[in-house]
């Protein structure tokens, strides 16, 4: 199981409360990291014991978002 990753979320993810949604889910699950808008996507660097649960919730997004794709890349560290 992964415990960290760099997540790129593409679709309608800006202006729909996506970053506050990510923050709330991360806080609730004890996930650490960062989230930022980068052009037409949101980039999340995240790590923690419940990373897979966090990834599943982020992949669904908040109600106003439309997720077209989610890509998970390795995030350095152990």
Residue ranges and their predicted role:
Residues 1-78:
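Intrinsically disordered, low-complexity, mixed-charge
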């Amino acid at each position: 199981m992964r415990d960290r990753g760099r997540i790129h979320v593409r679709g309608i993810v800006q202006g729909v409360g996506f970053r506050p949604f990510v923050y709330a889910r991360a806080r609730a699950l004890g996930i650490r990291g960062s989230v930022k808008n980068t052009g037409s996507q949101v980039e999340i660097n995240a790590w923690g014991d419940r990373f897979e649960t966090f990834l599943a919730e982020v992949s669904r997004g908040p109600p106003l978002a439309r997720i077209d794709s989610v890509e998970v890349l390795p995030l350095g560290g152990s």
